[in-house]
Regions:
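C-terminal helical cap(s) of enzyme catalytic domains, especially alpha/beta-barrels
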Residues: 40-48, 91-92, 99, 198-242
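Conserved anion-binding
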Residues: 24, 29-33, 40, 47-173, ...
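A short, Lys/Arg-enriched amphipathic alpha-helix followed by its capping loop at the start of a domain
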Residues: 16-22
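Acidic, divalent-metal-coordinating active-site segment for phosphoryl/phosphodiester hydrolysis
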Residues: 11, 179-183
Length: 242
């Protein structure tokens, strides 16, 4: 199972998450109590295991800003929130594929869940599966407070059938209000490809609680292992198997 610890702001927190078995570390490069700079991420990146992915989280960021941040912060993935350019993922994919010196960059798109959003989410999933513009779709909570990191959750039972319909076409990541105590329920209900957490493992905004980080990762992996079956689709790379 793929697990991202997001909203990380320090080397100590990033290393602890990696050593606890996280698949990816998320760095918020947008207005947020967890915001970090490209320089901060660049200082952290060399000290993480190379098989742990490093995601930059962007809100309404343009093409040039994202490309520069990926290069300067040594990111391996981008998470895109609310950009008005529907072609941005495809343009980013083409750009990084054309750079011979660039390693493959993973692209996550984010949508906030609500009942009336289901047709749009399914359309995006079909388009993504056909054109390969994104690697996964992160389904977060809808909140007036901000984009991600709000600690609120959506109705997993209501979203269950959406996850089941879309999963054969596209990897889905569950996010929004997850914590060590409920991540097992989320995995059992939604059967996501991955999970993403920020506030649910914090001691304070931007500062992780080591025990909660370790418990979240342990509970997620144990639950996934219990549900795993030979028919589950294989992931495309070894990083997701961590």
């Amino acid at each position: 199972m793929w697990i991202k610890i997001c909203g990380t702001t320090s080397l100590a927190d990033a290393q602890h998450a990696a050593n606890s078995g996280a698949s990816a570390i998320g760095f918020v490069l947008a207005p947020s109590p967890r915001r970090v700079t490209v320089d901060q991420v660049r200082a952290i990146a060399p000290h993480l295991p190379r098989n742990v992915e490093r995601y930059g989280v962007f809100v309404d960021a343009g093409f040039d800003e994202i490309v520069t941040a990926v290069r300067d912060a040594d990111l391996t993935g981008v998470q895109l929130h609310t950009n008005d350019d529907p072609d941005l993922p495809r343009r980013l994919r083409a750009h990084f594929a054309a750079e011979e010196s660039s390693a493959p960059i993973s692209i996550l798109a984010v949508l906030a869940y609500s009942d009336d959003m289901e047709p749009q989410i399914e359309t995006i999933a079909r388009h993504a599966a056909r054109y390969g513009a994104i690697d996964a779709l992160l389904i977060d909570s809808r909140s007036p407070v901000g984009h991600g990191g709000t600690g609120t959750r959506y109705d997993w039972q209501a979203a269950q059938h959406l996850f089941r319909r879309v999963a054969p076409q596209l990897r889905l990541i569950a996010a929004g209000g997850l914590n060590p105590d409920n991540v097992a329920e989320a995995i059992r209900t939604l059967s996501p490809w991955g999970v993403d957490v920020a506030t649910g493992v914090e001691a304070a905004p931007g500062r992780k609680d080591p025990a909660r980080v370790a418990a979240f990762i342990r509970n997620a992996r144990e639950t996934f292992a219990q549900l795993k079956s030979p028919t589950r689709p294989r992931t495309r790379d070894a990083r997701a198997a961590r």
